[in-house]
Amino acid sequence: MKLLYTEISYSMTEILVKEARAYADKGYRVFYIAPNSLSFEKERSVLALLPEQGSFAITVTRFEQMARYFTLAKAANRQALDDNGLAMIFYRVLMQLQEDELKVFHRLRTDQAFIAQLVELYKELQAANLTAFDLTTLDRPEKQEDLITIMTKAEQLIAQGDYDQSSRLAQLAEAIKSKSLDDELRQTVLVIDGFTRFSAEEEQLLALLNEACEEIVIGAYISQKAYRLAFTKGNLYEASLAFIQQLAQQFQTKPIYTTSEKVFDVSFSRLTQLLEANHDYSQLDWQLSAKDKSKVVIWQALNQKEELEHVTKAIREKLYQGYRYKDMLVLLGDVASYQLQIGPIFEKFEIPYYIGKQEPMSAHPLVQFVESLERGRRYNWRREDIVNLLKSGLFGRFQEGELDQLEQYLVFADIQGFTKFSRPFTLNSSRQYPLPLLNQLRLAVVTPLQQLFKSQKQLGASLLDKLMTFFKTIQLADNFEALAGSRREADREKDEEVWKTFTGILETFYQVFGQEKMTLADCLALIKMGMQTAHYRTVPATLDVVSIKSYDLVEPHSKPFVFAIGLSRSHFPKQTKNTSLISDQERASINEQTASYQRLDVPSFENIKKNHQTALSLFNAATQELVLSLPTSLTNSSDDVSPYLKELIALGVPVIEKGKNRLSHSAADIGNYKALLSRLVAINRQGIADDMTSEDRNFWTVALRYLKRRLADEQLSLPAFEHHLTTKPVAPEVIETRFPSQQPLSLSSSALTVFYNNQYKYFLKYVLGLQEPESIHPDARIHGQYLHRIFELVTKDRSNAAFDQKLGAAIAAVNQQSAFQQVYQADAEGRYSLEVLKGIAYSTAPVLNLNQGMQVAKQEEAFELALGHQALIRGVIDRIDQLADGRLGIVDYKSSARVFDIGAFYNGLSPQLVTYLAALKNKGQGLFGAMYLHMQEPRLSLSDFKVLDDQLVAAAYKELTYKGIFLAQAKEYLANGSYHLNNTLYETDELETLLAYNEQLYLSAVKQIKTGHFLINPYTADGKSVQGDQLKAITRFEADLDLGYARRLVVLPAKERRQAFLTRMNEEIKHED
């Protein structure tokens, strides 16, 4: 074994490539080994250093891949399971285990995160040359017992599928021990680059290869100064030193110092030497020069967005200087927090990029399809699962409009479960659903699903055949291809990887579970688990892209220009978190009991060494310029400066406060089309910034003027979102079509209430005609109709029968009507509602029998009230009562408590009773009032009554009173009836004021409606909260941010409130006149 080390200012790759080439020229086969995370980049750099740009004798690869070269022929019929297959194995094991078989993990059997932990533990035990039986020092013996149970059954399933139970490295080690590879290995040389530690499995293999191979060459970056030190704890090179010294001791060889022809910029090595002195407690008699400080700089930005925009502008500047995208590298302190923002910002500046990170498949439509299919079977055709299955776009060939209609009908008819899905749709409503079309869609959905779901317990291979037949029937492959074809090229590459993973999971299922009997539910659950835990990685379509990855995966001298962002204290240094099933303390205890070449990694014990090594690589990652950046605000929370950056600042590395991106006329701002257009749109929205220079201000003013002129020529305009709740008027021709000018505008009291609640709600409901989802289940409207019908029959009954008999007969008759039978006898919920309503009817109806001097003149009386040629008000009055003197009163049944509030009426929110009075008055009828009757079952607190006597009955009847507007002149006729007269009596002139103001409310609304401009203005009573309908899903109204758009109601003090409102009404009426 040959151990090489060099200063970080030299190229270890060049040194090792030179060694590899020398052995290749002698006829040896050379394997150039790099870590998994660096193998792709290392292969490119190695090939670039070879004079012929390639070699058949030199293979750049990883340990595991190298093992395949030697063992592939000997294990041709056996494959290794990938992570997706292992997840399916463990899920199957946990499904088969009973709860009492697991003492610690029994509650986690179906937990996806637990299964992922088992997969990682299984692989980690393989790399550590351990089994679950070796975990003897866990905190709880029951924990080891559970792991032994799970791992043993998993290995049995793996053997059942004839998959490899050992790793590739273990197979190679066994082959070496058997002497079957001696001839090949004698002609083999290993060159190992980029490592600072080996796993136990790699150490064992390395020891065997050292005896069998011609040579093993290992290189590492270590300064000569560090190598000569006796005490290395906390040294910047501690990880590399420990690595090389341990190998030197084990294999009895002396490390050799060497150099490369290539020498990188001394500014980075000088910075490294100063840092090294800080960590080994020595001193240097020189400082960073001006040239050194120009090569390394620290940026401080306001937030992540500003930070990324500064980076993209800097990249574009480098492009103008003649560099290429592949010369740039962006390193992220925290990939997860930056990943969502990178795409939009880099695309705005038209910078191609590649993020070297595995992505989960869980959000892909194919995974959602599999999840919905499994849930549809498990939950017996639950509606939302079937709808999600169809909305994935992968089931059959349906038009979007057809699926919308089907979903609306499923909600309306409450189609749940196989029984309802299997029967023809027959129920309909006033909306007249297209039942023939819907039944065609139903058959297209139900037929293939029913064929699949009726599968009985059988072999996994047979179930998979049925599943493949189902996929063919619904045209899954064609639909997936159409879906991928409609997406961007980058997304199409992701789709290809997802499809490969999906087919791989099906193949694994067939191999492992093909000969095992199981139910369809278990089959789908296994495939779903494989899909949910799967990840994919795409490769860049071209090499000329900006590479983006986590900063802890970088190696020295990676790219000419490196931008490391997000280097806050929270992420630099990176704090390793142990999320496995075995704690660090347990790992350390296990390692004390194991033999050589058996070891579990203990992340926290090596954290400091690893972080120093990462910082060393990061500070030397660039060959020309290095930018280290941190946002002062990271994901909406402030963060402190990294201790490593504090060291650099103390050494004199300059800090630049980047601040907010300012618009200028520099090449970075105007040299890219999308970025230029984006800035012009921003200026159009926000105006020219005051802090611009006069030259910048002039440039952008002229550019914006020019763009607007060009857009006007094309009949286009710039978007403006600064007032996101500002609405545009409806086109006059649309208003004319919807509300013809030669006809009066049709209104109702409920439409007027909606208008004054929120004008935009009126627009949605009465102009666009949008409707809320309806349901076959009875709602408040149906309940009201039911009680109305009962009261109507009771009041029409002129027989001499007792009132209770009349009421019972009316209830029985209404219950037999088909419209009510359909909704109240369909299920238990409907029958329960019916019983509640019958109780309300029995409680409320007696009030009809109390006013013997009153006659019911009419019921369900329709009316039309014309307000000149401007408006026609239509409505239906529930009941009209008549006094003995012929005067009429209006009764409106309500299912909830309602009173006439003059303040609500003044603000347009309660015009119903006054509108009804106007309709009767218009016919020349005398009036005595208009009132609400709350249909209810009175509820009283018995604790309020000392004695349960007649007072309880009187209190119950007190709740059942008519409340509304009454004429003072009719008081003598009403005093002995069930009327609430306190503060509800109005003189004739006051009633005239109400009627006149009511007309003004209608005419004002008509005038606004005719303009076609509908405001988003839900009302607020207190100016602090919004009570009107905000329609958040449509308008994006946020009460705390958009309170200024709300319509403020007029609220007056309680003292003499009624008179004050009447006075205001009179004043406004006179003003209009």
Swiss-Prot record:
Its EC number is 3.1.-.-. This is ATP-dependent helicase/deoxyribonuclease subunit B. Heterodimer of AddA and RexB. It comes from Streptococcus equi subsp. zooepidemicus (strain MGCS10565). NCBIfam families: rexB_recomb. GO terms for biological process: double-strand break repair via homologous recombination. GO terms for molecular function: 5'-3' exonuclease activity; ATP binding; double-stranded DNA binding; helicase activity; hydrolase activity, acting on acid anhydrides. Keywords: ATP-binding, DNA damage, DNA repair, DNA-binding, Exonuclease, Helicase, Hydrolase, Nuclease, Nucleotide-binding. The heterodimer acts as both an ATP-dependent DNA helicase and an ATP-dependent, dual-direction single-stranded exonuclease. Recognizes the chi site generating a DNA molecule suitable for the initiation of homologous recombination. This subunit has 5' -> 3' nuclease activity but not helicase activity. It comes from the Bacteria. Its cofactor is Mg(2+). InterPro entries: ADDB_N (IPR049035), DNA_helicase_suRexB (IPR014141), P-loop_NTPase (IPR027417), PDDEXK-like_dom_sf (IPR011604), PDDEXK_AddAB-type (IPR038726), Restrct_endonuc-II-like (IPR011335). Belongs to the helicase family. AddB/RexB type 2 subfamily.
